[in-house]
Amino acid sequence: MWIHFAPLKIPFSRRLQTGAVLQWAVSFLAMAQCCIALYILLLFSRYWYLAVLYGVWLYIDWDTPSKGGRRSNWVRSWTVWKYFAEYFPIKLLCTAPLDPKYNYIMGFHPHGVLVVGAFGNFCTEGTGFSRLFPGLTPHLLMLPAWFRVPFFREYIMSGSLVSSDRSSAHHLLSQKSGGQALVIAVGGPPEALDAKPGELTLQLLNRTGFIKMALTHGAHLVPVLSFGENDLYNQVNNPRGSLLRATQEKLQKIFGIALPLFHGRGVFQYSWGLLPHRRPIYTVVGSPIHVTKTPCPTREQISSLHSLYIAKLRDLFETHKGNYGIPEDRSLVLC
């Protein structure tokens, strides 16, 4: 396979964009492991007392990721995130105003390989979330295990990431002042195994937990479609029923995270690497579905709202797909 090298002469701004995405990729894929190693090294060094002090802090602060986290507007507004968003570029599009008097559950679709669009739009100000949705505080849900990693937890919480456990969602959606927006990648890690260029397969038909949560708390539902999310990485072919897919699904059940075999581009060449390709992401936030608080929803109520949500998501896709290069005969694939 021929390697397609990047040209030597490119605008400095593009180098800054690549650097911004490189630091994100390293943070996403390796920072947690490095933080664990750093803590162990610190524990067995002459500065062991610092590790002990941090361990005490970790014990005291253990539940913070389930109680709204510890966001930092300063971190969210770093200039690096502007370059991160410009790399693809990522665009956040508002189709209807969201009244900050209410709390919301935003269903983000698709998950993609590394949830790039959700991070860029809701964990940073790189695409201007606060300008588009004044009065709303976004919280992207992430697997609880990541918040047990020393040092790494502080970094991810600063960007509005919170634990995805039930108590975390309950805490945020119980805020009577409103203005809380929970962002849930509904398909979860399993959906990453279907994240391939040109495809849009969503795991949604059996996902009703977020629907019940919305009813229980009276949180309005907002479908969000991120066009281009699946085009950022190439993935080894793993059709359902294949040995590779069965192995991936088994490992996902054991470890709780998906393990897609993917590749993108490198820093100095476009053929292979862990950086995502420069392909646009258009994240379209749909109109809110108003939900009446129902503390003990029945199966029929959950099913009815779930069907309405799917219908609104399909409408959002059909309305906007032509704007982003998707053929008119293409439909969402739900499983």
Curated annotation (Swiss-Prot):
A biological process from GO: glycerol metabolic process
Reaction catalyzed: a 2-acylglycerol + an acyl-CoA = a 1,2-diacylglycerol + CoA; a 2-acylglycerol + an acyl-CoA = a 1,2-diacyl-sn-glycerol + CoA; a 2-acylglycerol + an acyl-CoA = a 2,3-diacyl-sn-glycerol + CoA; a 1-acylglycerol + an acyl-CoA = a 1,2-diacylglycerol + CoA
Transmembrane segments: 24-44, 104-124
Compartments, record wording: Endoplasmic reticulum membrane; Cytoplasm, Perinuclear region
Enzyme class: transferase
EC annotation from Swiss-Prot or TrEMBL: 2.3.1.20, 2.3.1.22
UniProt pathway: Glycerolipid metabolism; triacylglycerol biosynthesis
Any single GO CC term annotated in Swiss-Prot or TrEMBL for this entry: perinuclear endoplasmic reticulum membrane
Membrane topology according to the record: Multi-pass membrane protein
Keyword rRNA processing tagged: no
Keywords of the record: Acyltransferase, Cytoplasm, Endoplasmic reticulum, Glycerol metabolism, Glycoprotein, Lipid biosynthesis, Lipid metabolism, Membrane, Transferase, Transmembrane, Transmembrane helix
GO MF entries: 2-acylglycerol O-acyltransferase activity; diacylglycerol O-acyltransferase activity
Glycosylation site list: N206
Origin: domain of life: Eukaryota
PANTHER family, A to Z: ACYLTRANSFERASE, DIACYLGLYCEROL O-ACYLTRANSFERASE
Family assignment from sequence similarity: Belongs to the diacylglycerol acyltransferase family.
Function text: Involved in glycerolipid synthesis and lipid metabolism. Catalyzes the formation of diacylglycerol, the precursor of triacylglycerol, by transferring the acyl chain of a fatty acyl-CoA to a monoacylglycerol. Plays a central role in absorption of dietary fat in the small intestine by catalyzing the resynthesis of triacylglycerol in enterocytes. Has a preference toward monoacylglycerols containing unsaturated fatty acids in an order of C18:3 > C18:2 > C18:1 > C18:0 at sn-2.
Protein name per UniProt: 2-acylglycerol O-acyltransferase 2
Encoding gene per record: mogat2
